[in-house]
C-alpha cells in the first residue's frame, strides 16, 4: 500500500508529471530541468526528491553534477511500471508536454553550460548583471 500511495502522491503535481515526461527519453541535470520548468532550483530539487522516493526516476552523479532519468522499467516494481505506462499513454500528445519538448530541445542544443557561469569563464555576479541588462532591451 505504501508504494501505491507514494506513487499516487508523486503524480499529483503538474510539474512532477512534466519532469517525468521530460525524462522519458533522456537524462538531464537539475539546471536543465529547472530551465525548462522555469522554477527555482530548490523547488525543482524538491520535486525530484519526491519522484525519486516514489522510484519513478533514478539519479547518477557524473563529476560534480547529478543527472536524472526515468527509472528502468525492466527493473521497476509493478506499481511503477503501471504508473509510467499510464502517464506516457495518457500524456504523449498533450500540448504542455509538446511545448516542454520544444523548450528542452532548445536547452539541450545550447553549447554553453547552464549550470555554471564559472565553467564559461564568467563569475556569477557578472553573468547576472549581463543577463539583467540584456533583458531590459
Which stretches of residues belong to each language-model region?
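A general structural signal for well-ordered secondary-structure junctions
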Residues: 17, 29, 57, 97, ...
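Alpha-helical interaction segments
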Residues: 37, 55-59, 76
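Beta-hairpin "wing" of winged helix-turn-helix
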Residues: 53-62, 69-71
Amino acid at each position: 500500500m505504501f508504494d501505491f500511495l507514494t506513487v499516487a502522491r508523486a503524480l499529483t503535481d503538474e510539474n512532477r508529471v512534466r519532469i517525468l515526461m521530460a525524462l522519458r527519453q533522456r537524462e538531464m541535470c537539475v539546471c536543465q530541468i529547472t530551465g525548462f520548468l522555469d522554477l527555482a532550483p530548490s523547488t525543482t530539487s524538491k520535486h525530484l526528491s519526491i519522484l525519486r522516493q516514489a522510484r519513478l526516476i533514478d539519479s547518477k552523479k557524473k563529476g560534480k553534477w547529478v543527472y536524472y532519468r526515468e527509472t528502468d522499467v525492466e527493473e521497476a516494481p509493478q506499481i511503477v511500471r503501471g504508473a509510467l505506462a499510464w502517464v506516457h499513454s495518457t500524456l504523449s500528445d498533450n500540448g504542455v508536454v509538446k511545448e516542454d519538448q520544444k523548450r528542452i530541445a532548445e536547452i539541450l542544443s545550447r553549447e554553453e553550460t547552464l549550470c555554471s557561469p564559472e565553467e564559461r569563464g564568467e563569475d556569477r555576479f557578472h553573468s547576472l548583471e549581463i543577463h539583467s541588462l540584456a533583458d531590459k532591451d
